[in-house]
């Protein structure tokens, strides 16, 4: 635990998180040990979240036993924040992706045959409640009523699950749930007031240059500063275009940008890598031309891997 906490503490101090919050987090770690069978679910994410204000708001709410709802546009770091919070709290992470066909059995579990006996095959919500995990409720506004009804009792003061034919499950005191939602996307629905009232809500701001550079430097500490700044500028230019409705958010893809930069390590030219990671994410001819124009202002076609890696 000591080595694990030392790394977390350094990250929090680098983000200039208040010492009072760091102290409470340390107490949380000491109070709630992780059981051996789920220790592999506690891992440091590839990308850590950048942003003091959002981190402090999230940590404070979770320390007080509240659940979080992260709302915001694409590429604002919602899932990165979820993974980072699970890591800094030292809790096993359970990812639950909602879609129109998700029902209560997918969340809690369903009956199955084991050694000629009917037993409950535990779902992610059940396991999260049992082991004190952090449940990531991804795209929660795509959930239908059957799935939402399960969430009501676990998200409010009752903190329990009633399973017909089985015992009542009380949530482990370290259990927390973090929902994410992209508002207004196809297939999504309005969250009802009763469900929203069970969350503390954070509206995720759009990424700025510092936060994009933070992500790129985590992945590519050996990259040329000027090149990484150019890639960050490309992302921000596309973000502005998407905000004003000139393009869709398909090409506004931070994962695609990171993958494109990675591909240049294997000798692929930066412009070809960006073609795969960013430009080709749009399938509309006219939109693709706009994205290509934006790329040409930031990434010269003459660039090679040496311009990025020296």
Regions from the language model: what does each represent?
Residues 1-310:
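C-terminal regulatory/interaction module of P-loop NTP-utilizing enzymes
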């Amino acid at each position: 635990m000591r080595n694990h906490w030392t790394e977390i503490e350094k990250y929090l101090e680098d983000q200039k998180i208040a010492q009072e919050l760091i102290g409470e987090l340390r107490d949380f770690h000491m109070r709630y040990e992780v059981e051996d069978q789920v220790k592999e679910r506690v891992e440091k994410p590839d990308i850590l979240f950048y942003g003091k204000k959002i981190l402090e708001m999230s940590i404070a709410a979770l320390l007080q036993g509240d659940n979080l709802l992260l709302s915001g546009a694409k590429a604002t770091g919602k899932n990165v924040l979820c993974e980072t919070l699970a890591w800094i709290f030292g809790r096993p992470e359970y990812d639950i992706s909602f879609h129109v066909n998700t029902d209560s059995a997918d969340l809690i579990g369903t009956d199955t045959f084991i050694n000629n006996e009917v037993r409950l095959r535990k779902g992610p919500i059940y396991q999260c409640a049992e082991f004190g995990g952090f449940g990531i409720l991804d795209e929660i506004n795509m959930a239908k009523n059957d799935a939402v009804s399960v969430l009501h009792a676990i998200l409010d003061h009752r903190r329990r699950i009633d399973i017909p034919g089985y015992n009542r499950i009380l949530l482990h005191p370290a259990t927390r749930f973090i929902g994410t939602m992209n508002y207004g996307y196809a297939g999504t629905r309005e969250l009802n007031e009763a469900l929203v009232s069970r969350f503390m809500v954070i509206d995720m701001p759009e990424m700025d240059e510092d936060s994009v550079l933070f992500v790129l430097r985590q992945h590519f500490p050996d990259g040329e500063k000027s090149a990484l700044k150019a890639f960050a500028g490309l992302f921000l230019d596309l973000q502005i275009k998407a905000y004003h409705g000139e393009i869709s958010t398909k090409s506004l893809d931070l994962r695609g940008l990171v993958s494109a930069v990675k591909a240049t390590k294997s000798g692929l030219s930066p412009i070809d890598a960006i073609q795969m990671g960013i430009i080709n994410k749009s399938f509309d001819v006219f939109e693709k031309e706009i994205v290509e124009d934006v790329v040409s202002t930031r990434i010269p076609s003459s660039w090679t891997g040496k311009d990025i890696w020296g």
